[in-house]
Amino acid sequence: MSRKPFIAGNWKMNKNPEEAKAFVEAVASKLPSSDLVEAGIAAPALDLTTVLAVAKGSNLKVAAQNCYFENAGAFTGETSPQVLKEIGTDYVVIGHSERRDYFHETDEDINKKAKAIFANGMLPIICCGESLETYEAGKAAEFVGAQVSAALAGLTAEQVAASVIAYEPIWAIGTGKSASQDDAQKMCKVVRDVVAADFGQEVADKVRVQYGGSVKPENVASYMACPDVDGALVGGASLEAESFLALLDFVK
C-alpha cells in the first residue's frame, strides 16, 4: 500500500498574521508536487484566515491547532469546528501533548473532537506520545496504544483510514533529543498495529502515521526511510520558510 507522505509544520503560538503571510508567500510557489508529498501548516487561530487566503491555489494544506467538539454555544474562548470548515481549513491537530498537559485534555475530549472534525468535513491529525518516565519504564507501547484506541473509538473504518496519527514522544518535543530511527519505526508500527487490531489490516495499511519530536532537515530523510513512518509533524524547524522547504526535500 502506497501512502502519500505528509509533512506538516506546527507553528504552535508563534507568528502574527503579517509574519504568517510572508512565510506562505515564500513557500507557496516552491512546494513539491502534491503527487509526491503533502505539505501542511498548522497555524494559530488568529493567523488562519491569512494563511488560507495566501495559500489558496497552492499545494499547501492548512490545519488548525485545536477545536472544540460542539459547533456553537456558550463555550467562551473555544474554536468552532463548523467555522473552521467554513473558512476553508483542511485539517485540525488534536491531542497534542501540550494540550493534554497544560489544558488537561482527556482521551474522551480528543475522541469527541475527532468525531466533530469528521462531522464537519475536515480531517484530524491525532497526536499521541509517552513521557520519558513511561518510555524508561518500558511501557511506551502500552501507553500509546491506549491513547490511539481511545481517540479512534466509535469512528467508522473509512474515517480511521482517512485520519493522520502523529506519534510524538513527549521527551523529544522541543528538547533537542530525538527518537532513534529504530524507536520511531517501532512506535509508528505500534500505532499501525493498534489500528489493525481495532479496525482491520486494510484500514491500518491506509492510515498515515507521522513522527514528531525534534525533526529537522538533517534527520527527516532517516525517519522517512522507515516503512511505518509516513510523514512528520514538525515544530521549530517549520518556523522558517527555507527550513520548511528543506524538510520537504527528502527522498522516500
From Swiss-Prot:
It is found in: Cytoplasm. One of its GO terms (biological process) is glyceraldehyde-3-phosphate biosynthetic process. Keywords: Cytoplasm, Gluconeogenesis, Glycolysis, Isomerase. Homodimer. Belongs to the triosephosphate isomerase family. GO terms for cellular component: cytosol. CDD domains: TIM. Involved in the gluconeogenesis. Catalyzes stereospecifically the conversion of dihydroxyacetone phosphate (DHAP) to D-glyceraldehyde-3-phosphate (G3P). Gene3D superfamilies: Aldolase class I. GO terms for molecular function: triose-phosphate isomerase activity. Substrate binds at residues 10-12, 174, 214, 235-236. Pathway: Carbohydrate biosynthesis; gluconeogenesis; Carbohydrate degradation; glycolysis; D-glyceraldehyde 3-phosphate from glycerone phosphate: step 1/1. Its EC number is 5.3.1.1. It comes from the Bacteria. It holds the Pfam family TIM. This is Triosephosphate isomerase. It is an enzyme of class 5 (isomerase). The active site is at 96 (electrophile), 168 (proton acceptor). The gene is tpiA. It catalyses: D-glyceraldehyde 3-phosphate = dihydroxyacetone phosphate.
